[in-house]
């Protein structure tokens, strides 16, 4: 059933809570896309999620996040228990490792063998999302001598951010490669690649997809300063962009995030790329049945910016109120959009790629785009685009007259059309892929009468 909401909702799902009833409840509440985070699930667990979702509705698209290239502290040595406490002013050596060396009070090992080479004196290193901070005060060929600026408990495998410094990391890790190949085999629609720094990272993922003949679309997650510095080339090389405000907020001052988000959204809309806003949008609803006013305003601000989608993470993956979180987000979207929900649909046909529907969405028109698709993949990828309602037709029509008659009948299943309703119809070439080739604007009665007469004449 058509749900009057232009802004789409991406909901993260975990394998420990993924029954058919749960998926259906989230979908009925307003979820449009299911996200799976490969950092927190095995391949078997991810397969269970995909199979369950597609049993509920094969039209629900699946997005999987890669873990991406990242820097982490190695495991804390056994003699220190679970953590090592450091105070402001303490000094430690930082060395690169293949991951086998244990971190001690004197030497902090990080899982990038070449890290000493890449980091200069004066650089800041943020550990555990900024809970601890060290600054490089000296450097030798073998190690960095660092001083704690912010102390605290250092635990095993905590993340490390180095703002404004380019680290030589692989574009695709071995785990990423395995999950990308798994995604190809398991009917996934989007890959959200983490910690994208340049177009080179996207091309590395695309090469794997091309080698398998896959149509999976790449969403680039912007999570660090290097990604921001190269945002234009990243947008150009990507299908879409996710503004991942968690890690981005570690590297940038908190007050810089809103303007950064707005600039990325504007660039994506101009480039006709879907854009998703993510991280802690309704985070209090992990434990509370109601969001804070600030969270509602955050969601509303993203919707006012006309983003394609807003995303829920822990709220639906592990929170106590997953369905309520989706319902809340959907209600906010409908409230913000309610002055623009008059159903005067624009019909788009794209038999292969969904490209025309995505381009129409980029204009952020006041009217809903009804996208008639003849392939399930096109229907799924358009489910992420702003204001687009993708409809699957099993029978491909070979001329515009049959298409228009069929489309009007099909639209009546979603919302009754009045004879005086004005429609804009964008259609393709009904042959070799040539993209959209015509636009027609007329009221329902005129379209129906004219094209039914032509179809009847063709049968004679």
Question: Where do the language-model regions lie?
Answer:
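Non-catalytic helical/linker scaffolds that mediate oligomerization, partner binding
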Residues: 1-460
